[in-house]
């Protein structure tokens, strides 16, 4: 168990610098990467491609976004009331 945690800590990567979002407030960065992940996932699924290429966006938004925001956005996408264009 402790070895698993140590391995996760060793392999953990945070979001890299993105020059589109140079300021300290990363809210827009979080939102954009959430949208980019779901757009990429939708496009790759439609093409029959490998969705794993979208994993970078997922890792970034999981690192930046609060869990409550992500769960709310996921719920709204499921209900069809999500405000973003995916």
UniProtKB/Swiss-Prot annotation:
The gene is COX6B1. It comes from Bos taurus (Bovine). One of its GO terms (biological process) is oxidative phosphorylation. This is Cytochrome c oxidase subunit 6B1. Component of the cytochrome c oxidase, the last enzyme in the mitochondrial electron transport chain which drives oxidative phosphorylation. The respiratory chain contains 3 multisubunit complexes succinate dehydrogenase (complex II, CII), ubiquinol-cytochrome c oxidoreductase (cytochrome b-c1 complex, complex III, CIII) and cytochrome c oxidase (complex IV, CIV), that cooperate to transfer electrons derived from NADH and succinate to molecular oxygen, creating an electrochemical gradient over the inner membrane that drives transmembrane transport and the ATP synthase. Belongs to the cytochrome c oxidase subunit 6B family. Its main location: mitochondrion. Pfam families: COX6B. GO terms for cellular component: mitochondrial inner membrane; mitochondrion; respiratory chain complex IV. A motif (Cx9C motif) lies at residues 30-40. Keywords: Acetylation, Disulfide bond, Membrane, Mitochondrion, Mitochondrion inner membrane. Component of the cytochrome c oxidase (complex IV, CIV), a multisubunit enzyme composed of 14 subunits. The complex is composed of a catalytic core of 3 subunits MT-CO1, MT-CO2 and MT-CO3, encoded in the mitochondrial DNA, and 11 supernumerary subunits COX4I1 (or COX4I2), COX5A, COX5B, COX6A2 (or COX6A1), COX6B1 (or COX6B2), COX6C, COX7A1 (or COX7A2), COX7B, COX7C, COX8B and NDUFA4, which are encoded in the nuclear genome. It is found in: Mitochondrion inner membrane. Residues 27-73 form the CHCH domain. The modification N-acetylalanine is found at residue 2. Pathway: Energy metabolism; oxidative phosphorylation. InterPro entries: COX6B-like, CX6/COA6-like_sf, Cyt_c_oxidase_su6B.
């Amino acid at each position: 168990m402790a070895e698993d945690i140590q391995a996760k800590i060793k392999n953990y990567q945070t979001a890299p610098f993105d020059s589109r979002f140079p300021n300290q407030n990363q809210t827009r960065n979080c939102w954009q990467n959430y949208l980019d992940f779901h757009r990429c996932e939708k496009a790759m699924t439609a093409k029959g491609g490998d969705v794993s290429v979208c994993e970078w966006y997922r890792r970034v938004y999981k690192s930046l976004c609060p869990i409550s925001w992500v769960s709310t956005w996921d719920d709204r996408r499921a209900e069809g009331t999500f405000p973003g264009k995916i």
